[in-house]
Amino acid sequence: MWRGKKIGIALSGGAARGLSHIGVLEVLRDMGVEAKAIAGTSMGSIIGSFLCSGITLDEMEEYVGSMDWKSFLLFSDLALSNTGIINGRRVERQLKKFLEDKTFDDCKIEFCCVAVDILTREKVVLTKGRLMDAVRASISIPGFFSPICLDGRLLVDGGLIEPLPTEAIKALDVDFIIGSSITFKKDSERYRYLLEENCQLKKDQTYAYHNIGISNNDKFREMISRFRHRVRKNNEKTVSVQSILDTSMNIIHREMASRYTELADILIEPEVGDFGFFDLTRGKEIIQRGREAALAKAGEIKKKLRLR
């Protein structure tokens, strides 16, 4: 191993898909990789803060495995405000169960997380104060979670500027950076398919309206039958509010992440494009994707870090 060298790990955002970082970290642990510093953005800040404050990966996975659809209610408190549809108090209560009132100084592994000052449009790297407050700032997706006021700044999700916090981890004077950044190749295929299917449904509707008279009952019934079949077939695969939100966040992540992935000495990219933004109930599967991505890079990791 790189004796005396400081290894840092950067964990990207990604909402539920960011749970894949747990699988990545498990593989790195089993390989004997010892991180001296961790930086997180959004979901990466949750996982990073938990690990650095002493919560084990096994404990995290156990909690994720216990989630069901009701778990979403534990994080959702609708807010009738102009700043976000979710107030964030329930999220804060859940974070406090794990982080209590621990501060950055209590961390066993050096930690920082990234947020954005929505007023000045500046990146803010948080390194002091209560972990819970810093994480709450880093996960505050604009328009979704209400922003948090911290040290005179109005803070939102760090993924707007630095979705993979390699610059933040580099500032902690690390010698080697491992980045874990989610990717969405399957997502692109899925939404291209949905777009084609929805466009075809529109064409069928238009054709039926303009070209088939009501008097031509056989053709009309055939067209309606085909149309209904396509609707049933795609009943669970429609372009919904969630799919639009998923795709929007993916676009932001893709466009912004490229400049930060280049700073990583090793880049691990869990393929989680077929999972949704809120797929907390599929956490075990998402974690497994992280394991698979890290194992695929095991040879490169061993070579670069001179592991046996």
Predicted regions and their residues:
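Patatin-like phospholipase
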Residues: 1-41, 49-308
